Amino acid sequence: MPFSNSHNTLKLRFPAEDEFPDLSAHNNHMAKVLTPELYAELRAKSTPSGFTLDDVIQTGVDNPGHPYIMTVGCVAGDEESYDVFKELFDPIIEDRHGGYKPSDEHKTDLNPDNLQGGDDLDPNYVLSSRVRTGRSIRGFCLPPHCSRGERRAIEKLAVEALSSLDGDLAGRYYALKSMTEAEQQQLIDDHFLFDKPVSPLLLASGMARDWPDARGIWHNDNKTFLVWINEEDHLRVISMQKGGNMKEVFTRFCNGLTQIETLFKSKNYEFMWNPHLGYILTCPSNLGTGLRAGVHIKLPHLGKHEKFPEVLKRLRLQKRGTGGVDTAAVGGVFDVSNADRLGFSEVELVQMVVDGVKLLIEMEQRLEQGQAIDDLVPAQK
């Protein structure tokens, strides 16, 4: 769990090699980058709010790896973490985001009119479509490091801003601590609410402290636009609906997100952003757009095909189990989404998903007929 600086000072009584974590069995990005020399160089540093190197890496020390996805193994505790510990974060970001260099600049495009097609993904295969991102409010620590007071202030600010949304975005806020166990579980099962904080990544990084204090979900009346408050990020903004109309989902996402940003600005708050990293979020895997456009897609044949992982890789897509990051696929249904977050715009990422999903459906249909798919295997995007 996050420590104060007095604890860090105490640790400096021991030589760096005595404090260096045992990463010999680890398979995450942090463990690939962190050497005893780098640890020695950075361990005495801290951000203005007191976040230290050990706070950054703890989740990756406690969680050696993941069977489906190469985890990042570190978190930021505030906006300054990415700068103070850049010797660690920069190579991790480059590794995780396909060679994204410290000198590269990120691009943003939240104009849904720039998306080609996407309103006709076959609903016989695509069960639901979803676009999400995260946003952090400048001036507050991020969830691994924020205090109870900060968390409550973020909740208050967010609820005030969201209550100003109108039209088809109008809705209400449900605080986690005022929900019954059954209500909570129903929302989780329907994929509307974040899981209880059982994920070891959440626990080891300190994001689950004081749970469920100041956590909750805001959603519009027909549950197609949702905002999670104070889970892994200050805000997670989600647009979702049944079926394959990704264009509609993305349009609602862009409109809602733009309105939320305007509402925060009217209260003199802005989102953490810089030209190099785009939108700043807790996990380095979400930097840039923070955007994950995904579909729940039925691929009973392709899902078992030996070429499936390679096809996804070439399309710059990734698969998760039906229930999310820590789960397996049920009944041939996969959660397929863009693998990238940084170095591509929002529109480009959603376009990759739309185009890729169409090809996956074509392959599935071929396999249903007992035909080969070799000629459909794409080149690397």
Curated annotation (Swiss-Prot):
Q: Whom does it interact with, and what assembly results? A: Dimer of identical or non-identical chains, which can be either B (brain type) or M (muscle type). With MM being the major form in skeletal muscle and myocardium, MB existing in myocardium, and BB existing in many tissues, especially brain. Interacts with SLC12A6 (via C-terminus); the interaction may be required for SLC12A6 potassium-chloride cotransport activity.
Q: Which UniProt keywords apply?
A: ATP-binding, Cell membrane, Cytoplasm, Isopeptide bond, Kinase, Membrane, Mitochondrion, Nitration, Nucleotide-binding, Phosphoprotein, Transferase, Ubl conjugation
From the UniProt record, which GO molecular function terms apply? Answer: ATP binding; creatine kinase activity
| Principal subcellular localisation of the protein | cytoplasm
For this chain, the Swiss-Prot or TrEMBL PTM comment says: Ubiquitinated by the ECS(ASB9) complex, leading to its degradation by the proteasome.
Q: Where is this region: Disordered?
A: 96-123
Q: What biological function has been recorded for the protein in this entry? A: Reversibly catalyzes the transfer of phosphate between ATP and various phosphogens (e.g. creatine phosphate). Creatine kinase isoenzymes play a central role in energy transduction in tissues with large, fluctuating energy demands, such as skeletal muscle, heart, brain and spermatozoa. Acts as a key regulator of adaptive thermogenesis as part of the futile creatine cycle: localizes to the mitochondria of thermogenic fat cells and acts by mediating phosphorylation of creatine to initiate a futile cycle of creatine phosphorylation and dephosphorylation.
**Compartments, as annotated in UniProt:** Cytoplasm, Cytosol; Mitochondrion; Cell membrane
Please state what the protein is called: Creatine kinase B-type
Give the similarity note. Belongs to the ATP:guanido phosphotransferase family.
Sites where Phosphoserine occurs are at S4, S199
Q: Where is this region: Internal MTS-like signal?
A: 130-138
Gene name, Swiss-Prot/TrEMBL? CKB
Instruction: Describe the reaction catalysed, as an equation.
Output: creatine + ATP = N-phosphocreatine + ADP + H(+)
